[in-house]
Amino acid sequence: MPAARSSVILAPMMLIRRGHERGHADHGWLDSFHTFSFADYHDPRWMGFRSLRVINDDRVAPGMGFGMHPHRDMEILTYVLTGALEHRDSMGNGRVIRAGDLQYMAAGTGVHHSEVNPSGEEWVHLLQIWIVPERRGVAPRYEEKSMTGATSGVLHLVASRGGRHGSMAIHQDADLWLGKLQAGDRLQHPLAIHRQAWVHVAEGELVLNGEALSAGDAAAVSEVEVLSLTATAPAQVLLFDLA
């Protein structure tokens, strides 16, 4: 970090969002937990965090899914944890993404899409993420990235403004990092001054700067120089570094 940083006095702040306290909707074919207010779940304390607006932890039954529907002016990312998801959109894309795959769609001026579980037997477990773009009216775009072979014990930059280091390019000053950890793995992530982090545990268990978190838990962190993560069981974590 820059030498001048050492002269700044930081008052660390961490706000924990426990998984069991999230909004919950069980529609039979869809079992969904909402980190932030979404659809019929509304909590004024949890309307989003910085540009991060939605993290939905969804399980979709075999053969079921979200039919063709519209979006505009939103950055939409989907990460598949188990199973598979079939994507179709009005841009002409038709893909099946599987466990370990990330999908990005810039809704921009407007796009229609559907997301369906193509399996006749297996539920699909996924995270759907919405980030508010820094400008409206961009051209719709689709991209995907496979992380199935990603090295464990490392944070991988998977999305960023401008698409740094081969990551998917999004329309916001937000970096999304993905980590796959084995028990005992330790990771550190420097957090620049005036930036804040949202850490979401997708699977497993870990300790973040002294706080124990398990699957579905999350934490908002600011005013720290370094985020320290230690896996206490095999885990997957998403780290959002936000302006």
Segments predicted by a language model, with ranges:
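Jelly-roll (double-stranded beta-helix
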Residues: 2-243
